[in-house]
Amino acid sequence: MFRNQYDNDVTVWSPQGRIHQIEYAMEAVKQGSATVGLKSKTHAVLVALKRAQSELAAHRKKILHVDNHIGISIAGLTADARLLCNFMRQECLDSRFVFDRPLPVSRLVSLIGSKTQIPTQRYGRRPYGVGLLIAGYDDMGPHIFQTCPSANYFDCRAMSIGARSQSARTYLERHMSEFMECNLNELVKHGLRALRETLPAEQDLTTKNVSIGIVGKDLEFTIYDDDDVSPFLEGLEERPQRKAQPAQPADEPAEKADEPMEH
C-alpha cells in the first residue's frame, strides 16, 4: 500500500480507516528504553531502564516527580514528556490551591487524555510521541495508568512500555496473581525481574542504569537513583542464563557422538 498518500497529516484517514501519523507516534514509544509499573494493595512501583546518549553523557532521567502522591515514567520523546509533566504539575498545584486537596489520580489521567487528544484532530499539529506510566495513590488506593499518543489511557494492575517490553509483559502476566499480596520489597523485586527480561543476555541491571519510583499509603512519591538502588539490587538473584556453568575437567573424555542423548 502506498502509505505516502495518507500519512502527510494527522487529519487524513486512509481507506482502511487508519491515521498513520498516530501509528508513527505509537512507534516512537517502542523506541524508548523500557519501563515497568505494577501495584499491590498498598503501593505502586515504577521501575525504569536509563540510557546514556553516549559514553560522555549522563544517563537520562526516566522517572519524574509530579506531586507528593503521583509520579510518571516515560518511554519515547523526552521533550514531549517534559511538556506533559509540566502540565500535570500545574494541574496538581491548581487542585491544591483551589480545592485544598490532592488531585485524584484518575482525574489527572483524564485531563492528560484530553490534552493529548487535541493534536490528533487538528491540522498542522502532531501527536505527542511519548507513552507514560503513571503511578499514584489516593483515597481509592494505589493506581497504575498507561497513556498512549493516541490519547487512549488504561487502568492497569501491571504494565510495561518501551523497547523489548513484550518480554517484561510476559513476566508480569505470569506473576500477576502474586502482586496484590506482596510487600513493598517483593513488589520492587518483581518490577526489577520484569525489567531485566528486556535486556540482552550479556547485560544486567546496575545502579547506573536503573531508576525506581515508589508511592503508597503513608509514603510520598520517592525516586531512587544510583546508590539508593543498591539495597533493591542486592537481594535480586542472578539471571538463570547468566549463571556460570561448571567447567568440564580436562582429563574427562568427551561424550561419543554415537551415544544416544538422555531425555
Swiss-Prot record:
GO terms for biological process: immune system process; ubiquitin-dependent protein catabolic process. Its main location: cytoplasm. InterPro entries: Ntn_hydrolases_N, Proteasome_alpha, Proteasome_alpha-type, Proteasome_alpha1, Proteasome_asu_N, Proteasome_sua/b. PROSITE patterns: PROTEASOME_ALPHA_1, PROTEASOME_ALPHA_2. Coiled coil: none annotated. Keywords: Acetylation, Cytoplasm, Glycoprotein, Immunity, Isopeptide bond, Nucleus, Phosphoprotein, Proteasome, Ubl conjugation. The keyword Cytoplasm applies. The modification Phosphoserine is found at residues 110, 177. The modification N-acetylmethionine is found at residue 1. It is found in: Cytoplasm; Nucleus. There is a cross-link at residues 115, 208 (Glycyl lysine isopeptide (Lys-Gly) (interchain with G-Cter in ubiquitin)). Residues 232-263 are annotated as: Disordered. One of its GO terms (cellular component) is proteasome core complex. Glycans are attached at residue 110. It comes from the Eukaryota. Pfam families: Proteasome (PF00227), Proteasome_A_N (PF10584). Residues 253-263 have a biased composition (Basic and acidic residues). The 26S proteasome consists of a 20S proteasome core and two 19S regulatory subunits. The 20S proteasome core is a barrel-shaped complex made of 28 subunits that are arranged in four stacked rings. The two outer rings are each formed by seven alpha subunits, and the two inner rings are formed by seven beta subunits. The proteolytic activity is exerted by three beta-subunits PSMB5, PSMB6 and PSMB7. Interacts with NOTCH3. Interacts with ZFAND1. Belongs to the peptidase T1A family. Component of the 20S core proteasome complex involved in the proteolytic degradation of most intracellular proteins. This complex plays numerous essential roles within the cell by associating with different regulatory particles. Associated with two 19S regulatory particles, forms the 26S proteasome and thus participates in the ATP-dependent degradation of ubiquitinated proteins. This is Proteasome subunit alpha type-1. The lineage of its organism: Eukaryota, Metazoa, Chordata, Craniata, Vertebrata.
